[in-house]
Amino acid sequence: HPTNDFNYYIEIIKSIKKLLPNVHIQAFTPVEIVHFAKISQKSIYEVLTILQQAGLDSLPGGGAEILDDEIRAKICPNKANTQEWIETIKTAHKLGMKTNASELYGHIETIEQRLQHLFTLREIQDETHGFQAFISFPFHPQNTQLDNIKPITSYESLRFIAISRLVLDNIPHIKAFWMMLTLPIAQLALAFGADDLDGTVEEEQIIHAAGAKTGQKMTTAQLQKIITETGYTPVQRDSLYRKIK
């Protein structure tokens, strides 16, 4: 939000934790943490420490897009740069906060840049061991300034998930986000290296604004059925990948 100050977000975390003390709060991408640091004139370490003390438990891995500043300058010039994203992730890990990692592929990046992103994540994980999962997002060009780009194919998405599983052997889990991939491709992804069918979403606006036609809601029972149909055993987990049932 362009006008809210850092204290606004601190109070949100405190309020949630006060109301629901046993709930695990995963919030704020590295890009948002960098934004908080800039508007509060604090270091990334200070921002994360304050949020952790307020009740923040872990971070999602969003905003990574492609960790290459040449690409970032073209597709997301106002977001945190590569070094800021990496610094935020490493700092969170050093503070004992788990995070996820992500990648947006299928836009203007080269194959080499797409793969280098994976190797960068692998190097971070070798150092910090703080990533829980990797999730890749195929770019949806419709209704964007890059709407002339041919959408990535389902085959390319499945191949990239398989490559991710091979390269990121030090990251425990690979997600298949059905809302980005479509449900049939996410189901197939379970045979291509993914082990986390994500997720029971109530509402999603970003990719649907870019023309996605997938649904916006999936129940636990529906996900269990899809996993069972594929020949696997569904396991419900919490935010730290601990088995619930």
Question: What are the functions of these language-model segments?
Answer:
Residues 1-103, 107-116, 123:
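Conserved Radical SAM active-site core
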Residues 18, 40, 94, 119, ...:
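Auxiliary Fe-S-binding modules of radical SAM enzymes
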